[in-house]
Amino acid sequence: LFIFMGTGIMALAIQCIFEPIGLVTGGFSGIAIIIRKMTAGIVEGGVPLWLTNLALNVPVFIAALIIKGRKFLGRTVIGTVLLSFWLYVIPQVDLTQGDYMLSAVFGGVITGIGIGFVLLAKATTGGTDMVSALIQKYVRHYSVVQILQVIDGMVVLAGLYVFGLKPALYAIVAIFITSKVSDALMEGMKYSKAAFIITDYYKEIAD
């Protein structure tokens, strides 16, 4: 259920907030937006986002199968297919009417919630978030979200080249908000309590 909801929320942000104004916030979806823009003059409307998302994930799936095993890959395949499905069925509507700040804030919050839901299900939607999860296996002192920020930054630089400075700057704002929201969602689901008991009968309690 978390994967289903998370991918739907993410696709909504991509299709109806980020893509209409060229806001490249990272991920394979960001790369897909760039490819769509660059192929618009070759293919009518450019290469569809859902198609690019699926195509880019194939080599990552192979790596995940080797490193994480079938169980992790199974969840990730589901996430990737669902995200591509949502990107296919959700119509492109500019919800923010070209407002960059609203797109960065609103889109960042929505994307953060979506990513958080998917990660809570111990899965990813493929792409750079799956790459981040694989890398985190070897650098555990960094969170998946922190690693994701670095990779997404590289994608944003590519977006800077294609779409210009203004969208890239707002994309950075969106990425920051996304990371904070997804981190808060994940940490908020982890509950632990510590109790300090002061007593003269510590030996009896210890036994």
Predicted regions and their residues:
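Core subunits and conserved enzymes of cellular information-processing
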Residues: 1-202
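Terminal membrane-proximal soluble interaction domains of membrane-associated proteins
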Residues: 204-207
